Amino acid sequence: MADLRKVVLDVLKPHDPPISVLAKRLADVPGIDGVNISVYEIDQKVENVKITLEGSFKEITPVNEVVMDIGGTVHSLDEVVAGKKFIEEEQTLQERTQ
C-alpha cells in the first residue's frame, strides 16, 4: 500500500501546550519529515489550528494519539496526498469560471 505523503488536519486543542511543543511532538512521529501548525481561531480555553504534516507514513493513528494526548480533538481530515509524488489540487471548471 502506498504511503501518505501529506495530511492536513483541523484540530481543536487547549492553549497549553503551545503549538511549538505540539509541532515538536508531531515531528517525532516516525515517518513525519515536517510539521506546520497555524492558529486560525482563539477562544477563552481552546484554539483551532490547522496542522499540515509531510513525510512518508502508513497511517495517521500515531498522529491522532499525539493530538489526543495533549487534550486535543481532530475535527476533520481536510487534505490527503498519497503515492510516490505530490499531486497538487486543481480547480474544477466551475471554480475557474466563478
Please report, for each region that a protein language model flagged, where it lies by residue.
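Long, contiguous binding/interaction regions
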Residues: 1-98
